Amino acid sequence: MITGSEVYQVVEAMAPLYTAAALGYGSVRWLKAFSNEQCAGINHFVALYAVPVLIFDMVSTNNVYKMNGRLIAADTLQKAVLLLGLMAWALWERSRARGAGAKAKAAVSSPLQWVITCFSVASLPNTIIMGVPLLNGMYGPVSKDLMKQIVVMQFCIWYNVIIFLYEYMAARRSASAPPPASSEGSAKISPSSPVKAAAAAADTNGNAVAADRPQEVAVNIEITEMAASTARDGVSGETTAAAKEVSSGEVAPVEEEEASAPAPSMKHVIWMAVKKLLQIPNTYASFLGLIWSLIAFKCGFSMPKIVEDSLFTIRTTAVGLSMFSSGTFIARQSRFVPCGYKIASFSMVIKFLIGPVVMLFASLVIGMHGTLLHIAVVQAALPLAVTSFVYAEEYKVHADIMSTGVILGIFISLPVTIVYYILLGL
């Protein structure tokens, strides 16, 4: 049974997270110490440098030869079931929206956005920071290595899946947009960052409005490439005529351009998303860490100290700055629960009920029992990982839900996990 001192260890792990979030909230809400552009820059640093280094460190120090096969299989099955179920719902919702017409389609956000959000909330827990001290008090030191194995699978597979879906949505938007006309007949390279995007737009309350695509590089080139490849696949003569008008200096009205824009080919959209994924540091960090782990634990050597200390300096900023960024995000909203209480309650149900229940059934299917089964279910009831908010804010997709899930989830997770611990022990 978990003791009072072990509960205090969990509180010790929680307190620094809220300290960073409170500091970020107060710095923006009351002290006005950071502008919207600077807040976007902080989050961009975390996504571009701190998190990839943390990923590399976690993956490279995990002994892949001693991973628990049944736990990994149950974790993979849980996430696969959730993702496939959400994708099936998204396809059904998309077909229903098509039948309802363009107005109904415009009134509802993309189902794929909700797939990413619900999947992240349900299946990507804060395993290391919250899970290790909590499960250590419940099940002993054996839980620490098991938690690390789940984190490694998240970083190597599931976060890359999430990023691919983000990039897929961005590629579809870019491909569906008409190619920009140029008086010289050539596309322009216009790199943009979250800092520039935040500086370029503001809402009626003076808050920064997030751009649809924070990491776009040479988007105009990609749009033109997509249009050209679609034309090669057999686009109607209207597109060719429109291209001739642009090259001769005639610019059609925006409505006509949008109406005549060809539907992007699925294979080209996927190819553009894959190319973007291969340019992201997280992809390199996870697979380089995996390669290092395979070699190092096979040959029995360790990381040079100078490299290890350099990585330590960067990776220690990841969690603190992630929580700080979450606090600055909430401070820039008009209310403390940005997504609203109904959506917040819905996300808590997904996090603390749907995720653990699916994990329970997945574990039983794999044949797990005893302490291993209990650890698998309880870790699924841990709060949302801070990294999920970082990517949601970076790609500007339901960051309000993610920030609420992180902040409220840490408060709720302790009593919820204790309830699961008691129920599983009956």
Swiss-Prot record:
GO molecular function ontology, one term from the record: auxin efflux transmembrane transporter activity
Region entry Disordered, spans: 232-258
Keywords attached to this entry: Auxin signaling pathway, Membrane, Transmembrane, Transmembrane helix, Transport
Location(s), subcellular: Membrane
Topological domains, Extracellular: 1-6, 60-70, 136-145, 308-310, 369-371
Binding site for (indol-3-yl)acetate: 51, 126, 128, 159, 386
Membrane-spanning intervals of the chain: 7-27, 39-59, 71-91, 115-135, 146-166, 287-307, 311-331, 348-368, 372-392, 406-426
Record topology, Cytoplasmic segments: 28-38, 92-114, 167-286, 332-347, 393-405
Topology in the lipid bilayer: Multi-pass membrane protein
Domain of life, source organism: Eukaryota
One record GO biological process: auxin export across the plasma membrane
Gene Ontology CC annotation, any one: plasma membrane
Role, per record: May act as a component of the auxin efflux carrier.
Subunit structure: Homodimer.
Protein family (similarity comment): Belongs to the auxin efflux carrier (TC 2.A.69.1) family.
Protein name: Probable auxin efflux carrier component 9
Gene transcribed to yield this protein: PIN9
